[in-house]
């Protein structure tokens, strides 16, 4: 019987994964500051170390770590507590309690600064976070590397695409960030199969950072590493559409970005 701990189990992604894992017959231990009607649920603030919630990690086959501030607009103060301190506690609990693997919900915000470029987005590309949230996810990935190297914890980090809470998670022009947002759409089916495959991945997968998006037309996210590492193959795809207003906004943002880069280059070249 597969035993999985889900942190942040009451959230958008946590709810979808919980239902999927239940359908597989897995034993679930659910952690969230919000009460969940489930026999394996524990109400806990994971930013505060406590033996009661730490015990839930004991010899789990996998810890799916989703908990934290999910907002790209989160302040430094909120992500420090909920995305830095909390994530450190989760890694530490996984190691101390003998969990086999930790699957970390990272984000495409780690590379958001590459939005207006053209090259493929692989896990090896230089990180380019543009907000505290993106920085916190990058730190979570690096913690995973450290805990894997030092303590032998198997860690898989997913740079998760755009998986909506509303609109039945259907793609379309209603999604934010123009074509960039639509091209990183992640269907519920692909979300669930990606995490299922991560939990089931061979023991020799020691550390990996993988993109997790659906097969969307014109997307830049490279999925080859996910295919090779865990056997991920997207089930769904979309064809992005863009309104005139969104197209104009994207063009203006791209132009502003180029002006900023030009100004930065000029300032750096001067001898002040």
Protein language model regions, located:
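N-terminal Rossmann NAD(P)H-binding glycine-rich loop of SDR-like oxidoreductase domains
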Residues: 4-24
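NAD(P)-cofactor binding segment of oxidoreductase domains
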Residues: 63, 74-102
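Alpha-helical substrate-binding/gating segment
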Residues: 162-172, 185-207, 215
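Rossmann-fold cofactor-recognition segment
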Residues: 33-49
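Conserved Rossmann-fold NAD(P)-dependent oxidoreductase catalytic core, especially the SDR/UDP-sugar
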Residues: 89-130
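Catalytic helix-loop patch of NAD(P)-dependent Rossmann-fold dehydrogenases
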Residues: 81, 118-155
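Conserved C-terminal active-site "lid" loop/helix of NAD(P)H-dependent oxidoreductases
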Residues: 171-173, 209-210, 215-233, 247-272
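NAD(P)H-binding glycine-rich loop region in Rossmannoid oxidoreductase-like domains
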Residues: 46-82
């Amino acid at each position: 019987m597969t035993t999985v701990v889900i942190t942040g189990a009451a959230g958008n992604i946590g709810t979808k994964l919980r239902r999927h894992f239940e359908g597989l017959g897995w034993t679930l231990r659910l952690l969230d500051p919000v009460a969940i009607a489930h026999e394996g649920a524990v109400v806990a603030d994971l930013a505060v170390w406590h033996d009661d919630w730490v015990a839930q990690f004991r010899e789990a086959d996998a810890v799916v770590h989703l908990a934290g501030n999910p907002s790209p607009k989160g302040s430094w103060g909120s992500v420090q507590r909920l995305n830095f301190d909390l994530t450190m506690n989760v890694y530490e609990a996984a190691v101390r309690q003998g969990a086999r693997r930790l699957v970390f919900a990272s984000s495409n915000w780690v590379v958001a600064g590459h939005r207006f470029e053209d090259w493929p987005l692989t896990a090896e590309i230089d990180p380019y976070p543009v907000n505290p949230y993106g920085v916190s996810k990058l730190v979570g990935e690096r913690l995973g590397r450290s805990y894997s190297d030092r303590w032998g914890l198997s860690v898989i980090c997913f740079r998760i695409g755009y998986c909506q809470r509303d609109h039945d998670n259907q793609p379309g022009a209603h999604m934010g960030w123009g074509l960039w947002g639509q091209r990183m759409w992640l269907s519920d089916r692909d979300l669930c199969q990606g995490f299922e495959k991560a939990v089931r991945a061979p023991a020799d997968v020691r550390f990996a950072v993988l993109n997790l998006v659906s097969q969307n037309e014109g997307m830049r996210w490279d999925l080859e590493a996910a295919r090779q590492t865990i056997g991920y193959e997207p089930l769904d795809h979309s064809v992005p559409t863009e309104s005139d207003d969104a197209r104009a906004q994207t063009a203006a943002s791209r132009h502003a970005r180029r002006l900023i880069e030009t100004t930065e280059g000029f300032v750096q070249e001067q001898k002040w």
